[in-house]
From Swiss-Prot:
Gene name of the encoded protein: NTNG2
Residue segments, region NGL discriminant loop I: 69-88
Boundaries of every Laminin N-terminal domain copy: 35-286
Lipid attachment in record (GPI-anchor amidated glycine): G507
Assembly and binders: Interacts with LRRC4.
GO biological process, one term: regulation of neuron projection development
Lineage: Eukaryota, Metazoa, Chordata, Craniata, Vertebrata
Record's protein name: Netrin-G2
A Pfam family hit: EGF_laminin
Amino acid sequence: MLHLLALFLHCLPLASGDYDICKSWVTTDEGPTWEFYACQPKVMRLKDYVKVKVEPSGITCGDPPERFCSHENPYLCSNECDASNPDLAHPPRLMFDKEEEGLATYWQSITWSRYPSPLEANITLSWNKTVELTDDVVMTFEYGRPTVMVLEKSLDNGRTWQPYQFYAEDCMEAFGMSARRARDMSSSSAHRVLCTEEYSRWAGSKKEKHVRFEVRDRFAIFAGPDLRNMDNLYTRLESAKGLKEFFTLTDLRMRLLRPALGGTYVQRENLYKYFYAISNIEVIGRCKCNLHANLCSMREGSLQCECEHNTTGPDCGKCKKNFRTRSWRAGSYLPLPHGSPNACATAGSFGNCECYGHSNRCSYIDFLNVVTCVSCKHNTRGQHCQHCRLGYYRNGSAELDDENVCIECNCNQIGSVHDRCNETGFCECREGAAGPKCDDCLPTHYWRQGCYPNVCDDDQLLCQNGGTCLQNQRCACPRGYTGVRCEQPRCDPADDDGGLDCDRAPGAAPRPATLLGCLLLLGLAARLGR
């Protein structure tokens, strides 16, 4: 009977844009089967599942007992905070309790009695689960809102933090930022972090209590002021980079940096009126299940998705065993109105194993949670055989499933650094080499089983003394000259006695040794003539 009831509920008509049904029993030509849809859990009050932590230790009032007063009656300090007295204590849990009408219960910090040392507090809300905000975060302060505050979020259970929104009565002075309002942002800036002055200026502690992180104003940029065009919002959540992730978190942290001052400067004569007091923190959202579940419940002390589509894990972030023929993928809101489930599939559900026809075998890598192709053919490689092997490049005129999708680089072994090339087929050349395959030389080099710098040319490396440059490799020097570029006179043996005859070009000055020999001969001839 219960099985029939469950089947009946799954067969109810699908509500457009709600994404509240994960599967439906349908009849096909091959018989009845389940049809899957993208789905998500219902919105809930996340504060009912939160764990709160207040830092630093000793920031909560009452230990030891302490007097305090309000800004309205700053000199009537008859109020007392005493942690040992339940009627006078203000522990952190009172930020999330159910209050009777007309009676506010609240957490309260110590007063600023140690001024000028800063009065700062961190309030961390943790869910140990990835959640998505669907409405404004509303923080209610008794006795005045902080004049400086930062709201931060974490995506990794509090290991790292990033700013979510800045709050100050003067944004430029506090954070060096211009003040902005969420309602004035554009579609391209809806996920940017801003500083607002809207919730920090003094308006009387009993008049303005709320501090907001505006989710609805950001949604309204896409869905309209009444949030009626949800189809457009879902479309933008899928298509706008970073938008969906902006509303996703595991933890929130309020960094209270300066308390309410009552619209004036700090008055040193009465520091008991400066403190923080929070009566409520409202967080509306849903479990993030990657559009693979419509139910989320407390199990083993934390929220967990009740996964469909053959997925598993706290966020339905993995495929079940025996359903790993293809890599896990999150569901999608598109196409409207039911989205794409991207369900994990059993073995044999996909004949080509998503390898573009270059392999018919796949393997599941557990620690990476991916399915990868094995033994890619046609010189391909990669998770889906979508890349070319080293030494090959993509054929731009061929489709990914073409056997000739990868072309060999054919780099010249001597002129190239290695046998690999870039995506256009150009090889990495050694010094002096050029050309797509490195089989040519730069104009300043010549080829001889590799590229070598020119010895001579007709431009800058000229052969001297009438020499002729032969193929940029050497200078052919005229009689009487030698050297790389014919820059040195040549000396040859002159007789059998080992003397040297240094030829010189016409008009060249005689060498000193030759001149000395001539003088000696002239002297000898003069003596003989006597």
